Amino acid sequence: MDFPSRFDVIVIGGGHAGTEAALASARMGVKTLLLTHNVETLGHMSCNPAIGGIGKSHLVKEIDALGGAMALATDKSGIQFRVLNNRKGPAVRATRAQADRAIYKAVVREILENQPNLWIFQQSCDDLIVEQDQVKGVVTQMGLRFFAESVVLTTGTFLGGLIHIGLQNHSGGRAGDPPSIALAHRMRELPLRVGRLKTGTPPRIDGRSVDFSVMTEQPGDTPIPVMSFMGNAEMHPRQVSCWITHTNARTHEIIASNLDRSPMYSGVIEGVGPRYCPSIEDKIHRFADKESHQVFIEPEGLNTHELYPNGISTSLPFDVQLELVRSIRGMENAHIVRPGYAIEYDYFDPRDLKYSLETKVIGGLFFAGQINGTTGYEEAGAQGLLAGTNAALRAQGRDSWCPRRDEAYIGVLVDDLITLGTQEPYRMFTSRAEYRLILREDNADLRLTEKGRELGLIDDLRWAAFCAKRDGIEREEQRLKSTWVRPNTEQGQAVVDKFGTPLSHEYSLLNLLARPEIDYAGLIEATGGEAIDPQVAEQVEIRTKYAGYIDRQQDEIARLRASEDTRLPVDIDYTTISGLSKEIQGKLSQTRPETLGQASRIPGVTPAAISLMLIHLKKRGAGRELEQSA
C-alpha cells in the first residue's frame, strides 16, 4: 500500500482539539496522521458561531502565541468583534468574535492541507492497538491498521453519543453525524474512570422570519479588534450586527408546563450539563424569580439567513420549541430551520492524566477536549495543542512540557482538570487563575512564544514579528526612562496643559506614564514622540502603570515556586508518611499528584499534610524540582 501505515503521532478527530493537536505535532517536524470520520467537517463549529469571551479569549491568544490556528482562523472569518470588560483592568478584558461558520471551517481546512508532515485520512477509528500498557496504533472502521508510539484522542461528543429531542432519542455524535460506538466500547475496557456528560444547542432560526425592528441592535467595536498577534483588521470579512431580545412570562409558562416532556427533567438524560451555559429549561427552573432572560441573536454567516439564538438551548419536543420561540419578541413568526437538541456522551476522569495529557495507565495515549470533561472550542483547542506537542515530544524522545499556573491559562486549565477532576463540563474563567494580572490577553506572546520557538512550534515569520515587538518594547521603555521633562519648559508646560498635572520637579516620561491620569498616546502627543506599533505602545503602558502590582505578584510566585515544583516520587507510598490521616492518604493515593503544589490543591489535603509530606521527602532526599516536564 502506497499510503504510509507508520507514523510518529496519530490524532483521532478533526474538531478544535484535533486540528490544533495535529498541527502542533506536524509543526514540530514529526510525521503525523489526522484521522477524521468526515474531511468535510474539519474545524466545524458544532455549537455557537463564536470564538473567545471571558477567560476563553486568553486561551485563544495562548494557542496563537504557540503557533496555533484558532486566532488566525477567527480573524479571517470573524464578522463581528467586541472587547468585553473594556472599562475594567487589562487582566480581565476579553476579545469575542462572531465567526462565519463556513469561512472558519474553510480556513482551518486550508491550514491543515498546507501543513508539512501532516497526512489527513477519512476513516473512523474503531479500536486501539495496546500492548503491555503501551499504545501502538489504531484500527479503522474498514480494518486498516496505522501504527504510532503516540495517539491523541479528541473525540468530542462522539463517544457513545446519544441525541435527545423531547422523549425521543437516537445515536449520534452531533446532528447529522454518526457516533463512535465501537471505540466507546473499546475505551470502556481500559482501566480508566468513565462518566457521562451532556450539552445542548438551540433551534436555528431563518432570519427572514424575524422582526429585528423590535430588538436591540448590538454592533461590533470600532476600531475593529483582532484576535491573532499575526492578524490585522484587513483580514476581516464584512462586519455585521448581532441583536438582543428577551424571553418573557409567556415563554416561561410554556416551558414550565412542558417540563414533563423534557428528557432532562423526566430522568431520561443521566449526564450532567454545563453550569455556565444552561438550557432554557434549567434557567427558568433554577432562576424562577427572573421575569426574563436575554437572547442574543447571532448570524451564522454572511451567505446564509440562518441565525443562532444564543440563550435558549433546549431539548424539549419540537412542538414546544416552536411555541417557545414564537413567544419571544421579534420571533412571533419565526421559522425553525433546525431543532435544538441535547447530546449525552462519554468522558474520562481527567485525574487519570499526567500534566502532558498522557494517560497514567496507557503509555503514549493522550486525551484532549471534551473527552476530558471540558466544554468550549477554546478549552478544546488549548488541550489539543498541548497534547499534540507532548505526543510529538514523546516521539522525539524529549521531555514533556506543560506551562505552570503562573505562566498560562493553559496551565490553570490542565492543573484544575488533573488535580480536581470535574463532575460537570468545565469552562474557563479569569476567576480560576490566581495570577490574572500577569496572565493577560495582551501579553500571551511575551509569556509563551519563546518557549514555543524552543519546542519547534513557531515558524520564522512569527518569530521575526515577535522579536521585533519584544525589542520594540524594550527600546521604548528605555527611551521613556531616559527622557526627562522639567517644570517651566515647553515640554513641561505641554504636559500640564494636556493633563492638568503640575510638575513639582523633573520627571522621566516613564515616571509620568505611571500616573493614572496620564495615558501613553496623550503623553507622546504632548512631548513630541514618534508613533510606534500599537501593540508595543499597549504593552509599554500596561507594564508601566501596573509595575508595582506585577512586581508583587512575581515576588509571590517566586516564594511559592520552591515548594510548588517539588516533585513527588512516582512510587511514593502515602501510607508510610507518619501523621497523615487515612482520608488524606486515600485522596493522595487515588490522584497520584506529580508535585507538592498539585497535592496542595486536592480538596481535603490540608497545609499540615503538605508539611508532613515535605518532611518525609527531605528524609528520603527525594525532593527535586519539576521543570514542568511531567
Swiss-Prot record:
Signal peptide: none annotated. GO terms for biological process: tRNA methylation; tRNA wobble uridine modification. It comes from the Bacteria. SUPFAM superfamilies: FAD/NAD(P)-binding domain. It is found in: Cytoplasm. Homodimer. Heterotetramer of two MnmE and two MnmG subunits. GO terms for cellular component: cytosol. The keyword tRNA processing applies. PANTHER family: GLUCOSE INHIBITED DIVISION PROTEIN A (PTHR11806), PROTEIN MTO1 HOMOLOG, MITOCHONDRIAL (PTHR11806:SF0). Transmembrane segments: none annotated. It comes from Pseudomonas putida (strain ATCC 700007 / DSM 6899 / JCM 31910 / BCRC 17059 / LMG 24140 / F1). NAD(+) binds at residues 273-287. The keyword tRNA processing applies. NAD-binding protein involved in the addition of a carboxymethylaminomethyl (cmnm) group at the wobble position (U34) of certain tRNAs, forming tRNA-cmnm(5)s(2)U34. It holds the Pfam family GIDA. GO terms for molecular function: flavin adenine dinucleotide binding. Belongs to the MnmG family. Keywords: Cytoplasm, FAD, Flavoprotein, NAD, tRNA processing. FAD binds at residues 13-18. This is tRNA uridine 5-carboxymethylaminomethyl modification enzyme MnmG. SMART domains: GIDA_assoc_3. Its cofactor is FAD.
